[in-house]
Regions:
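A conserved amphipathic helix/loop scaffold
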Residues: 1-200
Length: 200
């Protein structure tokens, strides 16, 4: 009821194509899937395709976002976890990112420049700390038990929402001052490549 979709039949394990232009492409997937039809006013993210071609979409979405109370509610109608662990197709990441952006259009922190960065926001003594953790590596490769080298990220563009202009932005542990701009209750700056872990 809250999702405002109609469920069609029962869920089943099938092989099909899914994605879309906003997801950066179409990816093949074999997984458990529930067909649904969105009602009027429901936002759709991604579609199921009969072929790996934008000309052949079905009427079934990958995910939907619907207004609910003062916020929004979203759902994916297929299990992408196993497929992601096996294929690591960026289409899966993009679909999830797009849904999160629809739910949280103005996040506290935005990081662009790499898909392999985990961000942890902390606050202490009226200061904000952004932990940038390089998460690259063969985490999902069962044949790799350990590795001793990570690929550095590229430079990262970061925007952070704050109601007051900070006195300074520093990169730790080096203490390097980072140039930043402040406009519209957001600061924007660029962080040099992260080898393992950096703090701003």
């Amino acid at each position: 009821e809250q999702l405002n979709v109609s469920f069609i039949g029962k869920d089943s394990t099938l092989q099909f194509n899914m994605g879309g232009k906003t997801a950066g492409g179409i990816a093949g997937i074999k997984t458990n899937w529930q067909k649904v039809l969105p009602q009027k006013g429901v936002q759709v993210e991604g579609m199921v395709y009969t072929q790996c071609d934008y000309r052949y979409p079905t009427e079934y979405p990958v995910a939907t976002i619907n207004n609910y109370g003062k916020g929004k509610i979203a759902a994916f109608f297929m299990d992408m976890s196993v497929a992601y662990n096996q294929y690591r197709n960026p289409v899966f990441n993009n679909l999830i990112r797009n849904v999160i952006s629809a739910l949280i259009p103005d996040p506290q922190v935005k990081v662009t420049g790499s898909d392999n960065v985990h961000v942890v926001l902390g606050k202490k003594h009226r200061r904000a700390y952004l932990h940038l953790i390089n998460s690259s590596g063969d985490h999902f490769n069962k044949n790799v038990m350990a590795y001793n080298e990570l690929l550095s990220t590229g430079s990262l563009k970061i925007t952070y929402k704050t109601t007051t202009k900070p006195l300074s932005v520093k990169l730790q542990p080096t203490g390097e001052q980072i140039n930043f701009t402040y406009a519209g209750n957001r600061i924007e700056f660029v962080v040099p490549p992260v080898s393992v872990h950096s703090i701003v």
